Amino acid sequence: MHFIYRFSQGLRLRQVDMLQEGITGSSSTLTKLAYRLRGVCKSAIKRMRRRGDLKIGKRHEIVFIDESKFGHKRKYNRGRQSNRASWVFGMLGVKEEFRRPILKVVNQRSAQHLMPILQKHVRQGSTVVSDGWRAYNGLRDAGYNHLTVNHKEVFVDPQTGAHTQNIERLWGVCKATVWRCRRNRTESRLKDHLKVIEWTYWRGDVHKNGPLGMILHDIRRKYPV
């Protein structure tokens, strides 16, 4: 239960710490537990997507979009320095104090790759804020109210007040979370971590009993007795 609590709260999952604290006597047990809990989060997010609940925008919810590169770490920091990295496309719905991210690993940052993802998850007619990346030039024609910020000149547009600080903060949270979760060695593992982050914002933070209450609820859904 202590491990489940730490996982649901996004706390650091270093095996050496938990072994020293007596949470478990085996590192392999911890690895299996983490794998199972990531699976629980992924299943919960997939259920939401099948129901059509994983959408953002409209009704006073502004959507911030951006891309960020996540480098893959070498195991034990050995071997050649790896240049492998994955681009992640982030869409963040912001309404009052609520933050709801959708995070997708993408092969390219072109309009051809990004626009279909955005149109699938962001409701048409929404206000979308981005930087000046050319892949977003067609947003207005696609039915969105598009605001841009030219970071080469300003961080906040003086006329519209548009900025990208919300999603920049999200990237900081995402990368810190991936770092705590024993690094990000493959694209597949990165996708798992991103699903856990989505779960935290969409489910863990809104349950009346907090993230622990929601992870226990989702465990029962995935592994009914």
What role is predicted for each listed range?
Residues 1-225:
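Residue-level recognition of single "structural anchor" positions
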